[in-house]
Regions:
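Hydrophobic/aromatic residues within transmembrane alpha-helices
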Residues: 98, 110, 159-161
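Glycine- (often His-adjacent) and acidic-residue-rich active-site loop
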Residues: 28, 36, 92, 100-135, ...
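Secondary-structure boundary motif
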Residues: 86-89, 116, 139
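Conserved CoA-thioester-binding segment of acyl-CoA-metabolizing enzymes
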Residues: 2-101
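Charged catalytic carboxylate motif
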Residues: 75, 79, 129, 136
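Short, flexible helix/strand-to-coil boundary loops that buttress conserved ligand/catalytic motifs
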Residues: 72-73, 109, 118, 141, ...
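Glycine-rich beta-to-alpha active-site loop
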Residues: 134-166
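Residues that form or flank phosphate/diphosphate-binding pockets in enzymes
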Residues: 71, 106, 155
């Protein structure tokens, strides 16, 4: 009976902690509107963020946008958030390796998207969206390694700071 209660308490506590990790850090701050920025980011297509999960419990997250030296497009920012959510729910995960396709880790954000998001509120929303995603990545209960081969500029350098090792 005591073992059952302990397991139940542990699962409930673990569930609450994971729910807190998923919650946006910026709900309402600076008029942050996550749904609005998601719609705007969808307009900037290209590249992908791929996740493969090995049976050993190691995940490999690959930034794949070689045309722009793995720069984050709007859809890649959205995919990164989706992959982090997937990792938060991965029960068998032990570690995560983040890498870039080709000879560049990540050259930051796609400057065409940044330029198109020209007003200060949208810029603030994009920054908060990525900060929220990177904070959730940092809080994952996995050992994370940024495998930096080549350049890590701007948002790419920020991505490395969300990892345990680089």
């Amino acid at each position: 009976m005591a073992v059952f209660l302990w397991k139940n308490l542990f699962q409930t506590t673990k569930g609450r902690i994971l729910q807190q990790r998923r919650a946006s850090l910026y709900n309402g701050a600076h008029d942050y509107d996550e749904e609005l920025i998601k719609k705007k980011l969808q307009q900037f297509a290209g590249g992908s963020v791929n996740l493969s999960k090995e049976h050993s419990g190691i995940g490999i997250l690959t930034l794949n946008n070689s045309r722009l030296m793995n720069a984050f497009t709007g859809t890649m920012m959205l995919e990164l958030q989706e992959r982090v959510t997937e990792l938060e729910n991965w029960k068998d995960g032990k570690g995560l390796i983040i890498c870039g396709a080709g000879n560049t880790f990540c050259s930051g954000s796609d400057l065409n998207a940044v330029k198109a998001i020209s007003n200060s509120q949208d810029g603030m929303n994009m920054c908060m969206f990525m900060q929220n995603t990177l904070t959730r990545l940092m809080r994952l209960p996995l050992i994370s390694i940024a495998l930096v081969q080549g350049k890590a500029l701007g948002g790419g350098a920020e991505l490395t700071t969300a990892c345990d090792f680089s």
